[in-house]
Amino acid sequence: DWSSDVCSSDLKEIYIRALKLLPPDIKEGFKRLDATETHPTGKAILGTMIRNIKVAEDNTNLLCQDTGIPIYNVEIGTGVAVDGYALKQAIIKGCTRATQEHPLRSSVVHPTTRKNDHTSCGRHVPVINIDFSNKNNELSIEMIPKGSGSEYNSWLKMALPADGVDVIKTFVIDCVLEAGGKTCPPTIVGVGVGGTADLCVHLSKVAATRALGSQCADPEGAQLEKALSAVVNKLGVGPQGLGGDSTAFAVHVETAATHITLNPVAVNMQCHSARRARATFTPAGLSYGF
């Protein structure tokens, strides 16, 4: 029974690690953009962002003051027995402990009263997503603290099949332009295509939080990624929306089969502080990563 191994201390730890340690692929993304940025203001802003990463890590400080909405993506491999309710309670306890023991700013409030319990938890929060893999005897838990700047700029369009792929491309470009600097670019632009309305939005967030260098498993989605990536960094939005070549690290696409009468597309963005952390449990023990 794996539930005894998944304790709140581990889930507290990946929340804190996500807030303090930027994944290696994002650091490499910064180097790549810094090497190609030609706009003086954009170059200066990228330099400041890179220095911020170093200062945060050297001093074990947070990368950003926004501790986000906590999202836990749980992937259950073959041969793994998990007490789901116990795992949920461990996640809630881990979030609460991270917030109160570190301490962290709790960014989670009731939607109408705006009451903050100072736990980073509330009704249906942390967000917990469950998926399954063919990895033998492995339980993986990814933690993503999703900041409000990137989350606020989210869109869903229920397009028509007759609109084709062109409406998807136009919609994504319009969203990037409308977001401007509000998403703290350079961003990862996540695009969900297909499914139902809720699945499409979910896929856009999956895309936005994928590691740089990864590619959509659907060949058609991968082609769409290439086409959109070629356009987005020519829009001139630039770092923090103040102009430049570096509007996005990448455009990521995730697709799903959809109804014959539907053509949904959703956009969700991840800010330049594209934070995530992972805990992987196997019979050999626990390991942390990204």
Task: For each feature predicted by the language model, list its residue ranges.
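Conserved phosphate/anionic-ligand binding catalytic regions in large, soluble enzymes, centered on
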Residues: N59-E75, K182-C200, I260-N268
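Short, small-residue-biased leader/transition segments that mark boundaries at the very start
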Residues: D1-S8
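Domain-length cofactor-binding catalytic modules of enzymes
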Residues: D10-E13, E28-G29, A211, Q215-F290
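Translation machinery proteins
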Residues: E37-N61, D117-G122
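Flexible, glycine/charged-enriched surface loops at secondary-structure junctions
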Residues: L22-F30, T41-L46, T60, Q100-R114, ...
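A generic, well-ordered mixed alpha/beta core segment in the N-terminal half of proteins
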Residues: G68-N134
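Short acidic, glycine/serine/threonine-rich loops at helix termini
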Residues: V74-I76, G84-A86, S154-L156, D198-K205, ...
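Conserved mixed alpha/beta catalytic, RNA-binding, or beta-rich assembly cores of soluble enzyme
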Residues: N137-S214
